[in-house]
C-alpha cells in the first residue's frame, strides 16, 4: 500500500535512473555494436516506463489536481503540455538508431525536458496537492494508479488526446497491442 506521492515518486526515481544511465560516458572494453544494442534497450525501457507513467497521470492524477487544488487547472495544463511534447519526441525516438547524431540530440533534449517536468510536478504541484488531499484519498489514488499501470500503454501515443476516460475505455487494448509490438521489436533485434 502506498499513497499517490509514493507511487509517483517511485516512477520518477526509475525514469531518472534510466536517464542517468543513458548519460553515462561509455566505458571502454565493450564493442561498439554491443554498446549500441544496450543503449537501444535502455531507451526502449525508458519509453515504456515514461509512457505508462504519463498515461496513468493523465487518467487519475491530473483530474485529482484539477478537482482539489485551487490553481489546479493551470498547473495541470502546463504539465500536460510538457507531457504531450515529450510523447512526440519519444515517438520519433522509436524509429531512430542510437549513435546517429539526430537520435542523440533528441534523446539529450528529451532528458533535459523530462527532468524539468519531474521537478515541476514534485516542486510545484505535489506541495499544493499535499495541502488539500486527505490521507484516504491519497491512498485510494495511489492504489488506482498502481493498478492502472499494469495495463497502461507502453508506447507514447502522441496523437491520442491527453484526456481522462480514454485510458479507461481504450487503455487495456492499446496497452496489450503495445506489449505485442514491444515483444516483436525485441525479437527482431536479436
Ligand atoms: Fe508527468
Ligand atoms: Fe510524473
What is the predicted function of each stretch?
Residues 1-190:
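Small-residue-biased structural context
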Amino acid at each position: 500500500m502506498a499513497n499517490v506521492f509514493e507511487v509517483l515518486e517511485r516512477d520518477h526515481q526509475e525514469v531518472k535512473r534510466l536517464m542517468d544511465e543513458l548519460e553515462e560516458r561509455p566505458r571502454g572494453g565493450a564493442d561498439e555494436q554491443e554498446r549500441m544494442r544496450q543503449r537501444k534497450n535502455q531507451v526502449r525501457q525508458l519509453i515504456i516506463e515514461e509512457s505508462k507513467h504519463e498515461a496513468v497521470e493523465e487518467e487519475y492524477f491530473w483530474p485529482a489536481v484539477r478537482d482539489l487544488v485551487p490553481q489546479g487547472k493551470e498547473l495541470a495544463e502546463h504539465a500536460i503540455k510538457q507531457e504531450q511534447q515529450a510523447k512526440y519526441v519519444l515517438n520519433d525516438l522509436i524509429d531512430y538508431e542510437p549513435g546517429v547524431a539526430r537520435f542523440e540530440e533528441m534523446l539529450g533534449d528529451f532528458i533535459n525536458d523530462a527532468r524539468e517536468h519531474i521537478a515541476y510536478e514534485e516542486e510545484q504541484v505535489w506541495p499544493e496537492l499535499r495541502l488539500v488531499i486527505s490521507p484516504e484519498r491519497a491512498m485510494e489514488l495511489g492504489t488506482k494508479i498502481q493498478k492502472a499501470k499494469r495495463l497502461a500503454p507502453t508506447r507514447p501515443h502522441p496523437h491520442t488526446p491527453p484526456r481522462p476516460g480514454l485510458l479507461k475505455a481504450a487503455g487495456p487494448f492499446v496497452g496489450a497491442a503495445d506489449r505485442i509490438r514491444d515483444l516483436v521489436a525485441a525479437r527482431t533485434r536479436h
